[in-house]
């Protein structure tokens, strides 16, 4: 908990800071990157040139490659155990139980992502009850980091895309356009996010498409415009995906998360997370 408070302060500073910022934070256990894969400390955004940006993206690729290897090497029974523990934590969490509208990813086995199937089926299995949650899932619009979050009511609404990830068709079986989060007039309470690597300061490394960062920034702008409360952004992580604090290279476009769900439980990061978790 003490650690979480330190991270809250640091994370708040990072969220507000227009500069690249690799704070010095007390080291926590978990997975260490070798010195060769540690990020270079970056300077201010204004003085950033493309060469420096290239260097950060290069570091990101190195971290991705390291984590992909550790995920591939994970023992299958440990993976199953961790999938169960993480999903149980989510399903029993008050912030999950109370949420009315959420965006969640459809996990993909071949990408070694934390399984979300139990969470999704729990959401979709009570279509008529009062506790029904509105579920939105990603739909990749193009290769320029554009993604939408579309409403689904059944797993049958999904088909595999070219990346072999299940997603809804933007038009349903009746030929109607699906409701889209950015067009919808109700706020989202919760985002359940995928990613390749995370740290306990709120940094998240995606798969390199920029889809989530672009989407989350747009959603935050819309929430601000509408006066909506910001949603809770929670990522799910296997133990090898949790890196030493500060080892994830970031640019100002990277959106920080509020909390991590790990096999050992929830790691609240921001004050918003600490209040609701
Ligand atoms: N389940 C899930 N759905 C998602 C995402 C995700 O990360 N997970 N996305 C999140 O953005 C978006 C899709 N973006 C994706 C970006 C890259 C890859 C992918 O297969 N990457 C390979 C490497 C490919 C390469 O380097 O050329 C990999 O990570 O192994 C998949 C989805 C929307 N839907
Ligand atoms: N050298 C570079 N200079 C500028 N932009 C780049 C560079 N390399 C990649 N990009 C762009 O940055 C974006 C990817 O950013 P980043 O690596 O932070 O994504 P991510 O965090 O993995 O993705 P997501 O948000 O989907 O989880 C893409 O739009 C990509 O085109």
From Swiss-Prot:
Q: Which Pfam families match?
A: 5-FTHF_cyc-lig
UniProt transit peptide range: 1-48
Where, in this chain's numbering, is substrate bound? 113, 207-211
Tell me its EC number(s), please: 6.3.3.2
pH influence on activity: Optimum pH is 8.5.
Q: Name one GO molecular function term.
A: 5-formyltetrahydrofolate cyclo-ligase activity
Name the reaction it catalyses.
Answer: (6S)-5-formyl-5,6,7,8-tetrahydrofolate + ATP = (6R)-5,10-methenyltetrahydrofolate + ADP + phosphate
Q: Name one GO cellular component term.
A: mitochondrion
Q: Where in the cell is it found?
A: Mitochondrion
Name of the top EC class for this enzyme? ligase
Kindly indicate whether the keyword Metal-binding belongs to this entry: no
Q: Which keywords are on file for this protein?
A: ATP-binding, Ligase, Mitochondrion, Nucleotide-binding, Transit peptide
Q: Which domain of life is it from?
A: Eukaryota
Effect of gene knockout: Reduced growth rate and delayed flowering.
Whether Mitochondrion counts among this entry's keywords is yes
Extract the NCBIfam families matched here.
MTHFS_bact
Q: How does it assemble?
A: Monomer.
Q: Which family does it belong to?
A: Belongs to the 5-formyltetrahydrofolate cyclo-ligase family.
Kindly provide the name given to this protein in its UniProt entry. 5-formyltetrahydrofolate cyclo-ligase, mitochondrial
Encoding gene, per UniProt annotation: 5FCL
């Amino acid at each position: 908990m003490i650690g979480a408070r330190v991270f809250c302060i640091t994370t708040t500073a990072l969220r507000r800071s227009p500069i690249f910022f690799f704070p010095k934070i007390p080291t926590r256990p978990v997975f260490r990157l070798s010195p060769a894969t540690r990020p270079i400390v970056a300077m201010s955004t204004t003085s950033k040139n493309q060469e420096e940006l290239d260097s950060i993206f290069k570091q990101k690729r190195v971290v991705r490659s390291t984590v992909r290897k550790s995920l591939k090497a994970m023992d299958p029974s440990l993976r199953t155990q961790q999938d169960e523990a993480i999903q149980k934590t989510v399903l029993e969490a008050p912030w999950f139980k109370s949420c009315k509208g959420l965006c969640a990813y459809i996990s993909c086995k071949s990408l070694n992502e934390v399984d979300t199937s139990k969470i999704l089926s729990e959401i979709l299995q009570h279509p008529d009850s009062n506790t029904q949650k509105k579920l939105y899932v990603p739909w990749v619009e193009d290769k320029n980091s554009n993604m939408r979050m579309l409403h689904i009511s059944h797993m049958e609404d999904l088909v595999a895309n070219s990346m072999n990830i299940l997603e809804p068709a933007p038009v349903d079986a009746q030929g109607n356009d699906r409701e889209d989060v950015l067009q919808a007039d109700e706020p989202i309470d919760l985002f359940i996010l995928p990613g390749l690597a995370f740290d306990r300061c709120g940094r998240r490394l995606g798969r390199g498409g920029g889809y989530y960062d672009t989407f989350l920034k747009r959603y935050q702008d819309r929430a601000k415009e509408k006066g909506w409360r910001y949603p809770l952004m929670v990522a799910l992580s296997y133990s090898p995906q949790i890196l030493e604090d500060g080892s994830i290279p970031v640019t100002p476009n990277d959106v920080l998360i509020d909390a991590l769900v790990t096999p050992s439980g929830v790691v609240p990061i921001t004050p918003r997370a600490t209040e609701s978790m």
